[in-house]
């Protein structure tokens, strides 16, 4: 599609039925009346064809179509003008740039592969923007002239005069141990090497990030969450003018996410810039002062919008429509009505109930006590608790992979499990993997419609499993876990590496699958928005991480979330437009009111 097309025509293959209508779209089109072939369709054709080059965007066919099969979407006409960077011919291009403001946190929100990391690289001075001229890149003088009149002009001028030092916390923290060469490998020593702030500040960072216990450990012995906290700490102990954090919340539990957000906010000063890319929308909301959305087509083009306030920006992203540019970048809005979830549930009297006894498990110094509980078919139980409180241990106990110390054995049930860490060892393509492991389900049309299609597996079906990115692997792992016939599905952190949009789709897929097939799912999830969307019941884990923990019996979403948030000392409210949970700022009026009334998690009437 050339950039000159200012609109895009969509004809839904499912809805368009030329055999059953009188081709109203073609008859009513003013361009066809002048003798041009703008819409081509006959009673025998399978689907109508609309020429985007000839289309004038009048929208008459959209109104006339009896099946609502046509959409005409206006694309931004200025896409050609605002190219900031293009890697090479026929490759990804980025339009415009986010504008950081001193003394404020800028949040970036958008799907994977749409240019967020490219934008960070350019703002950090690691990539020189070529304004789309990849064959003869412009000089800095010309680049600054191009951005004149905007806040970016001052920013790049400062950067050229070496006045700006930028630090990026990388997106994939798993690669950090390999990148650190040299004799110094201990966490504490590495932090000391980079330390440019006062010892009091550094002590405070170490305390809030809970790094005291790992200071003497080697960097390669750290878990994912510890590496993430170490990476945030490394960025914070250095003096810089621009701090950039690429996905600071992956691997962290809810409490650590909020601590990380507080630390990132504490870096602000009147002359400092802080930029943050984050897919957990509740953390992004808590963290940012204003946001830029990046929309477009993944690995084709990305467009950065003008800055908007946090609430406005996240709602625009969920809605998929930008009022300022009168542009729709997603066909449907992403909604968080917990009512959606329960409407699918038919009151089935024939649902089976299962129960498990109270259990105790000791692993080294760690002791986990589990209260007895019960669950039934078509039910999703979300486990909430900090890292290191035994959620994965309970999953393994239920799966029969671990034996309890005392208490009865767990009744034998078929179990399918998606582990937290996914290591691809399979030597073949995704299709071969599915055929080997879940052939029956994979060929089942219902499974294709419910799970495979919405997770967009078709885009990666013929790629080598070992070459997939984190998010692609996660989607494959979810399909594999759901494809194995079982009574109970145990899913550990389904949101890791997925972007905000995929997280919501993934929640819907898991939910629909569990309800339709009358199964039970136990899910560990730290993204609070996703957890509340998925949960029918909640199991709260309390105690001291890595020492002793107590898993309570399953309870309702409201009482469970209230108990969990009370332990964290955090309150949530609901956004009136999109119904998503939003974190109240600490000691704000809402925060104090909700704490005094004991309502930590708010399910107001509009959301039910």
Swiss-Prot record:
It is found in: Cytoplasm; Nucleus. InterPro entries: 4Fe4S_Fe-S-bd, 4Fe4S_Fe_S_CS, AAA+_ATPase, ABC_transporter-like_ATP-bd, ABC_transporter-like_CS, P-loop_NTPase, RLI1, RLI_dom_1. The modification Phosphoserine is found at residue 349. One of its GO terms (molecular function) is ribosomal small subunit binding. Residues 70-320, 345-568 form the ABC transporter domain. Residues 7-39, 46-75 form the 4Fe-4S ferredoxin-type domain. ATP binds at residues 110-117, 385-392. Keywords: ATP-binding, Cytoplasm, Initiation factor, Nucleotide-binding, Nucleus, Phosphoprotein, Protein biosynthesis, Repeat, Ribosome biogenesis, rRNA processing, Transport. Changing residue 493 to Q: Lethal. Inhibits translation in vitro. Gene3D superfamilies: P-loop containing nucleotide triphosphate hydrolases (3.40.50.300). One of its GO terms (biological process) is ribosomal subunit export from nucleus. GO terms for cellular component: cytoplasm; cytosol; nucleus. Pfam families: ABC_tran (PF00005), Fer4 (PF00037), Fer4_RLI (PF04068). Belongs to the ABC transporter superfamily. ABCE family. PANTHER family: ATP-BINDING TRANSPORT PROTEIN-RELATED. Present with 6280 molecules/cell in log phase SD medium. Component of the multifactor complex (MFC) composed of at least RLI1, the eIF2 subunit SUI2, TIF5/eIF5, and the eIF3 subunits PRT1, HCR1, NIP1, RPG1, TIF34 and TIF35. The complex associates with pre-initiation complexes. Interacts with the complex YAE1:LTO1; the complex bridges the interaction between the CIA complex and RLI1. Component of the multifactor complex (MFC) involved in translation initiation. Required for the binding of MFC to the 40S ribosome. Required for the processing and nuclear export of the 60S and 40S ribosomal subunits. This is Translation initiation factor RLI1. The lineage of its organism: Eukaryota, Fungi, Dikarya, Ascomycota, Saccharomycotina.
